[in-house]
Structure formats: structure tokens, C-alpha cells
Amino acid sequence: DCNGKITIKQIPDYRMIYERHFGSYEHMHRAWNKLLVHYRDYISRDTKFIEITYDDPSLTEAKNCLYDIGLSVGEECRLENTTILLGGKCAVYSFKGHIKSIYAAYQTLFLVWLPKTQYRLDEGRNIIDIYHTVDCAAMEVEMDICVPVK
């Protein structure tokens, strides 16, 4: 059920350090752990932890799924592996729950909520996940699924 969990918001542009990976989304936590250790000096109270998944795991073989993970940084960061994520109008699904339920949240957003609205997917921008809290022991997260719309 997504009623009350989805709002339309203006998302800012984010400069982010990122790493690109191929593989099952189920093993993404390993890549995250390495990234967080490697870039720990760039993490501050204002850091956003951002994920971009490019493939639907029901359509793409797990080993071929593509994703970027990263963290927001200031303008002063000049590392080679930085990019600018374009913000703009997004449908933001505030998700709180077990990581295994994230896929169902995506399905609800795209198959139930979006078709019933006047909005359309803005395919010129990335769908991003912004993590607020992660409880590794319980496998629970609080995150925003940000779907660019027009």
C-alpha cells in the first residue's frame, strides 16, 4: 500500500562519488561496505547515500544487473569518479521496511500508483534511492525512492 507514502517533491542536483557494479542486487551490501570504508573521509552529517539501479531483476539475469552506489559530496571534491545527478520533480516514495520488500515497493510505484496519476516517467533522469537509515542486523531500511516525473 503506497497511499500517503508518495509525495511530489523537487529534488536537488547531487554531486556524488560513485562506483559502478554488475551483479545481483542481493549482494549490494558488500559493495556498500567497501565503498563506505574507502571513502570514509568524505562522509559528513550532510552526506546522502545514493543508489541507482538500472535493471529490473525480473527481466535481467542477476549477474548482469547494473547499479551505481555512492555518496553526495561538496563542490570541492575533485575525484575522477564523481558525477552530477540531476534533480527536479520526483515522485518520492518514503519506504520503511525489510530490504526484501523494496522490489514490491518499486512494483507498486510503477504498476499501481503511476498509471493512476497525471504524471509520466521522465526517462532523461535516473531513478535514485536515498538511504536515511540502515539496520544491517534486522535488514531494515528507511529510504526515499525518487522517481523522476513530468
What would you call each of these model-derived segments?
Residues D1-K150:
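A solvent-exposed interaction/effector surface
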